[in-house]
């Protein structure tokens, strides 16, 4: 009886030991097969090894571009965001031939030279497009700055022109005011006291001044004493009147040492100046001879009489 029990116990232990042995052997073979099995084709090796994906590398490159071009931030940022989305879509969507773009080491190991060149060209094209966007925005900023500077320069020039015109207007008004004061002073001098006419109204004084000027222009060469007698003035008063008229530009001419005033018109002065300019250096004798031809000293009344005869 005891022998049977011992044999049964020994048999049970043997069965247990054999079962454990076969289980361990089976488990070891499964692990060896799994270790020897190659990685799956659908999962990139770079992803299995923890290497960053292509999209992450592209984002890093775009971040560096953003740091190098801060001036083009507003519009370029939107373009770069669109490029990011496009890059993500490229990662998620297959290429034109229906295959996903290989990543990392798979790109080098499994992609042929032609396919790799195509992918590199595509990447270069994308980077070139992003750089063009940045350059375009920088160019717009530069053009806007130049336009602002040009507008500022135009405003400055307009302000300078306005100030210059204002200064010229003030000078002209001051000159006209002085000429008017000299005219009034000269007109008041024509009112004679004991030797001439009684003082008339303003119209009479204007007419008297106009007659005085016209008398000199008509006679061309006027003896100052005769001029004073004609207008009931003293000789010195007549000389002062002529000097005042010369000062304000009403009369042009010279008073010689014989007591005569020779009237020369603006046109005759211009003709003499033109002659001197054309001839260059001119002697006094040549100038005197030419002046006799350029300056008409014949009285108007005498010239009219000769023309009618």
From Swiss-Prot:
The keyword ATP-binding does not apply. Residues 24-309 are cytoplasmic. It comes from the Eukaryota. It is found in: Endoplasmic reticulum membrane. One of its GO terms (molecular function) is ubiquitin-like protein ligase binding. Interacts with Atg9; the interaction is transient. This is DDRGK domain-containing protein 1.
């Amino acid at each position: 009886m005891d022998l049977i029990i011992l044999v049964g116990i020994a048999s049970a232990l043997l069965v247990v030991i054999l079962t454990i042995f076969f289980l361990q052997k089976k488990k070891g073979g499964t692990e060896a097969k799994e270790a020897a099995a190659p990685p799956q084709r659908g999962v990139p090796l770079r992803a299995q090894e923890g290497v960053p994906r292509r999209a992450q590398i592209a984002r890093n490159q775009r971040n560096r571009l953003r740091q190098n071009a801060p001036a083009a931030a507003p519009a370029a940022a939107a373009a770069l965001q669109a490029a990011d989305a496009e890059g993500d879509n490229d990662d998620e969507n297959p290429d034109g031939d229906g295959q996903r773009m290989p990543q990392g080491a798979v790109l080098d190991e499994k992609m042929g030279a032609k396919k790799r060149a195509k992918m590199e060209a595509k990447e270069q094209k994308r980077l070139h497009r992003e750089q063009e966007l940045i350059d375009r925005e920088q160019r717009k900023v530069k053009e806007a700055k130049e336009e602002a500077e040009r507008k500022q320069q135009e405003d400055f020039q307009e302000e300078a022109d306005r100030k210059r015109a204002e200064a010229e207007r003030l000078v002209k008004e001051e000159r006209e005011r002085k000429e008017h004061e000299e005219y009034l002073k000269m007109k008041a001098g024509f009112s004679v006291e004991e030797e001439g006419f009684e003082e008339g109204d303003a119209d009479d004084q204007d007419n008297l001044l106009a007659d005085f000027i016209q008398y000199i222009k008509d006679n061309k060469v006027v003896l100052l004493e005769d001029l004073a007698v004609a207008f009931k003035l003293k000789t010195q008063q007549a000389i002062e009147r002529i000097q005042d008229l010369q000062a304000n530009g009403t009369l042009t001419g010279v008073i010689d040492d014989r007591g005569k005033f020779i009237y020369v018109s603006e046109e005759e002065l211009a003709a003499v100046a033109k002659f001197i300019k054309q001839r260059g250096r001119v002697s006094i004798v040549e100038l005197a001879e030419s002046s006799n031809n350029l300056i008409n000293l014949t009285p108007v009344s005498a010239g009219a009489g000769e023309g009618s005869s």
